[in-house]
């Protein structure tokens, strides 16, 4: 972690907006380029929060006395906080239940019950327990996370009719309209190929765009297995859902991680614990070896 990254103020992830009323092939690259500026700010903070939870917690102080004795002890309470929340609040994966015993007029109550049961069975077929745990981890640590819902291309009899994928927040985000409704207007997921180029998948209500390096549309690009990345030659597909099928979840209204507000206290605890160890070591050497 660089000195600049250490001094970042963590106040939650930025929500990305656009003033564009309708995203089309003519302006999608421009909208993506502007949104990526804010996403990169979020991405830096997300990466640092994930590393912090894993134990990458540099001490924010320089030892000026007895530099030869510099024990750095990391308590990593951030990991303990995260594990508690994952176990306490996310111990069981999400399931659908009927809100009440009231049914729409003219409907068959057994049909609604069967539909909810069927939907839960499909979720189980999609291994939702592990996917919800991954969603929970990113939500609790980073404050935001996206999931992709897509049509399963070749479902088996025991499979769900849909794919549900938890996306890494380092490589995904959602853009919202800047009006009072804050409607999601485009979902973005991207990856890097073996040549270092970034391939963006941008989903709007009516289209799916494949864009390379925020410069041009992918045109018939194929993977090493010979499969086309897109189903069309110009990098544009029709969105069969009719709406953005990348959904962004927020842990809290300020989009912060579970331990983000206590970062200063956690850093102070690491310094206190390290200085205590240094004090014991220095006192021991002074008493037993004459401070040699």
Where do the model's predicted regions map?
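Intrinsic disorder/low-complexity segments enriched in polar/small residues
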Residues: 4-6, 10, 31, 41, ...
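Extended, regular secondary-structure scaffolds
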Residues: 120, 129, 133-255
């Amino acid at each position: 972690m660089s000195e600049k990254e250490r001094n970042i103020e963590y106040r939650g992830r930025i929500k990305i907006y656009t003033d564009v009323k309708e995203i089309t092939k003519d302006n999608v690259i421009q909208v993506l380029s502007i949104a990526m500026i804010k996403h990169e700010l979020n991405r830096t903070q997300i990466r640092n929060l994930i590393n912090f939870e894993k134990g990458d917690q540099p001490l924010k102080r320089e030892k000026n006395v007895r530099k030869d004795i510099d024990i750095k002890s990391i308590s990593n309470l951030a990991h303990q906080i995260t594990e508690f929340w994952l176990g306490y609040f996310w111990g069981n994966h999400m399931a659908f239940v009927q809100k009440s015993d009231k049914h729409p007029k003219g409907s068959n109550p057994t049909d609604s019950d069967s539909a909810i049961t069927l939907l839960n069975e499909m979720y189980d077929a999609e291994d939702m327990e592990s996917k919800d745990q991954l969603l929970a981890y990113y939500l609790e640590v980073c404050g935001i996370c996206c999931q992709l819902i897509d049509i399963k291309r070749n479902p088996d009899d025991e499979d769900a009719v849909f794919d549900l994928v938890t996306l890494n927040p380092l490589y995904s985000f959602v853009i919202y309209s800047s009006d009072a409704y804050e409607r999601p207007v485009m979902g973005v997921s991207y990856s890097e190929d073996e040549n270092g180029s970034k391939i963006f998948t941008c989903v709007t209500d009516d289209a799916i765009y494949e864009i390379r390096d925020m410069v041009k549309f992918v045109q018939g690009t194929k993977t090493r297995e010979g499969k086309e990345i897109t189903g069309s030659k110009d990098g544009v597909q029709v969105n069969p859902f009719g709406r953005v099928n990348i959904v962004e979840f927020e842990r809290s209204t300020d989009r912060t991680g579970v331990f983000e507000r206590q970062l200063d206290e956690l850093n102070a605890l690491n310094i206190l614990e390290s200085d205590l160890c240094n004090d014991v070591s220095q006192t021991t050497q002074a008493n037993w070896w004459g401070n040699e």
